Amino acid sequence: MAKKNMIQREIKRSKLAKKYYLKRLAIKDQLKEAGSFSDKMDLRQNSKEMPRNSAAVRGRNRCWLTGRSRGYYRDFGLSRHVFREMSHECLLPGVTKSSW
């Protein structure tokens, strides 16, 4: 189980990313249309003034059950440990153990 403060930090980052999403998108669009170098530098400075954690890239995928960040299966939102346990208990529909 991940530390509670790490999970809370990720929640805070996702909220900030949602809050500043449209503002970041507008700055990116303006950067594409900007012609002069000084305009681009001004727009980049505007993006740097936003909080660092408001960038969606800084978020990390975590298991919704344990909060583990490594060994994460994107399709299920689970870490590999929980995925294995739940699949053995037949709690994940359509998941079967392979045999060949």
Curated annotation (Swiss-Prot):
Q: Which UniProt keywords apply?
A: Chloroplast, Plastid, Ribonucleoprotein, Ribosomal protein, RNA-binding, rRNA-binding
Give the record's GO CC terms.
chloroplast; small ribosomal subunit
- PROSITE patterns xrefs: RIBOSOMAL_S14
What domain of life is recorded for the organism?
Answer: Eukaryota
Translocase in keyword set: no
Protein family per UniProt: Belongs to the universal ribosomal protein uS14 family.
Subunit and interaction comment: Part of the 30S ribosomal subunit.
The task this protein performs is described as: Binds 16S rRNA, required for the assembly of 30S particles.
What protein name does the entry list? Small ribosomal subunit protein uS14c
